[in-house]
Amino acid sequence: MKVILFGTGNYYRQSKAYIDMTQVICFVDNDPKKTGAMLDGKKIMTPKEADFTNCDYVLVLVMRYQSILEQLSALGVSRDKIKLYPDLDDLFEVKPCICSEGKQYDFTQWAANRPEKKVMLICHELTRNGVSVVLMHVAQVLKRMGYCPLMSALLEGELLEELQENHIDYIPQIHLFYGGRQFADFIGKMEFIIVGTIGIADVVWRIAHIEVPVVWWIHESNDKDFHDFPLLVRNNVYYYAGGKRVVECFKKHYPYLSVEKMLYYLPDNRVETKCRDAIFRIGIIGLIYPRKAQDIFVEAVKKIPAEKKNAISFEIVGKYIEPVIDMDKVLKENPEIQYIGEMSQRALNDYFAGLDLLVCPSRDDPMPVVVTQAMQYGIPCIVSDQVGQSEYIIDGKNGFVFPTENIKALKEKIIYCIDHKDILSDIGQESRKIYENYFSVEAMEENLLRIEDRVRR
């Protein structure tokens, strides 16, 4: 077998351990700066220089491969000659493993030692993003119900430690083999599969033919995602939406498909609430990038009169992803604002125990976990009308809602809370009822029982 590898970046570096370089003719890359260089003993060529008639397959090791497919088609390469990175297992010997209780097992060993009914949960990465954490919590509920859950993701990350602590088995990186025969055979042993985001649509398209029930739990509520990641119509694919806003966006694009609303479960892991000191703490928590609207929060804080900011700490918590605010400038010009950075879940629980008010001004946020966590702690929340929990909030009774990107309205809500600290405890207790009614373990068990009934029909 002779193979040309298209791509020399991150996906090649992750794949190279499995690739037999004696079968590789050359690399192809669109970056002119790499042309002519040698990589692992093979020359890097431009697409026009490579002789694709001299190979059996072209293996595309690029994440967004659609433009590469079009490019290869224009060069006369037939589609059946092209393999994508999830097909690596079809060309080379890939030995995926499952991590369980500190040990590694191949698919056959793991399945043989698990007599329980098995459910696989798939997300895009095993990091502390909302969807991955939510799926981990579902895995915990499935264990309570007698299932053997198995977490998997395209990429691994910092969630691995928590999976180990919770005794949840996982496959750390399926992006190199989810299109291959081994994975297809293994999927067939599952009772059903839960896929946690629209962004890994390609995985669903690859596994749906196996006829195992696929529960596609979509959490996105913007038109671009529904345009970029097409859904499919199959009898074994069941659609669920993580809130009212997701349902509305789903039906806008797919009015002919059935979809049911299913909210996530959040474990009640509250730590003891700290004694309040003289400082009134207002926090915004989440990845720092435009969708989370930290810029709106900062601008609202800047417009609050100075005399209202006495003994107030405005705190930004989260990992900096994209420039939405100039953090150094913000901190220098606004001493009442603090940047705390990213927190583990354990640290975040401790943080919530001392927080007085949460602000979530997101431009688009179907059902942010941090808002539910605040409600769990009985912390009053100010959210934009583009935040999913807003559908359960009665303004001024169990929280506060303002029009998205309306800096003046957010400023007024914050000032109201500063001026009426004496009623915030009651509002927080009312917000706790939202958590109990919609996000508890009992609610999730009922959801999973309904899924069981639906997929067995």
Enumerate the predicted regions with their spans.
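A short, well-ordered alpha-helix in the C-terminal region of glycosyltransferases
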Residues: A409, Y416, I423-Y438, R450
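Nucleotide-activated donor-binding/catalytic signature segment of Leloir-type glycosyltransferases, i.e.
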Residues: D326-M343
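Short hydrophobic beta-strand element within catalytic cores of glycosyltransferases
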Residues: S152, P380-V383
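Short alpha-helical donor nucleotide-sugar binding micro-motif in glycosyltransferases
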Residues: E342-M343, D350-L355
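A conserved mid-protein helix/loop that constitutes part of the nucleotide-sugar donor-binding site
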Residues: N129-H137, Y289-K303
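Aromatic "clamp/platform" in nucleotide-sugar-dependent glycosyltransferases that forms part
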Residues: R363
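Conserved acidic donor-binding segment of nucleotide-sugar-dependent glycosyltransferases
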Residues: D395-G396, F400-I407, Y416-K421
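Glycosyltransferase donor-sugar binding loop
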Residues: S152-G157, I285, S313-I325, G341
